[in-house]
Regions:
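Conserved RNA-binding domains used in RNP assembly and mRNA/RNA metabolism
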Residues: 1-123
Length: 123
């Protein structure tokens, strides 16, 4: 996973105890160090194909995601916008999963922390 904080800090590692209804989880960084992460401090949690990604990839957000649910556009407080699909968005929850509409991109799915967003639009 790639963990992006609201303060723009980025950490990479793995977790085996992240649950959307919990306020924190443990992250094992790529160097083996363990730490507790508080979800409210995050922008989003990115479940990625690789830690490096593809710097040459041009985001398209035009792909249809089979079984992905409703189309959603998320604008984060830092100005970044991601378009994808979700089956679990509710304005009453602290966050939700989405699958980006860019199947060739590095992100397989994203857990968006609602308090880090500026606008959320359903299509």
């Amino acid at each position: 996973v790639v963990v992006r904080f609201k303060d723009n800090t980025i950490l990479k590692g793995k977790t085996n105890n992240f649950f959307p209804n919990k306020t924190s989880f443990h992250l094992e960084l790529v160097n083996g160090e363990q730490m507790e992460v508080h979800v409210e401090e995050l922008k989003a949690l990115f479940f990625v194909k690789s830690y490096e990604g593809d710097k040459q990839h041009q985001k398209s957000y035009g792909d249809k995601v089979p079984g992905g649910g409703r189309k959603i556009q998320v604008r984060f407080s830092d100005g970044e916008t991601i378009v994808g699909y979700t089956t679990g968005y509710s304005p009453d929850r602290a966050g939700f999963y989405m699958v980006p509409a860019d199947l060739k991109g590095n992100n397989e799915r994203i857990f968006v922390v609602a308090s880090a967003t500026e606008a959320i639009e359903m299509a």
